[in-house]
Amino acid sequence: MYLEDIVKALNLRVVSGEERLTAEVLGGYVGDLLSDVMANSKEGDLWITRQTHQNIVAVASLKDHAGIILIQGCNPAADTLDKARKEGVPIMVTDMPGFEAIGKVYNMIATKKGPDPST
C-alpha cells in the first residue's frame, strides 16, 4: 500500500511532503504521546495524531514514518509546516474524527496485506 493510495481514497489534504507520496505504508500507529510513538512505532508506519507542533516532524523523521495524518481538522503550526517541508515529511489533514480515520486506514492496509497467517 502506498501513501498516495491512502491520500486519494480518504481525500486527505496534503500540506507537506508531496514528493514522498510514493512511500510504501507498512503499518500504522496511533498516538499523541511522543515518547510512546518513539518507543513503539515502526519504520514505514503511517502515524495518526492530533498533535500539531514541530516535534511531530522530528519523531516522524527519526522513526522514518511514511507520513503523518492529522485528524479532526487539526492544522499544523507554521513552524511545523516549515520543518516538515525542509525534511520532506508528508503531513496530511482530515476532518474525520480519529476513530473513523483509524478504521479506514487500518482496513486499507489490512486488505492490501491479506489475512494474518497467525490467526
What are the residue ranges of the model-derived segments?
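N-terminal, charge-rich interaction modules
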Residues: 1-18
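Histidine/lysine/aspartate-rich catalytic loop segments that bind and position anionic ligands
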Residues: 26
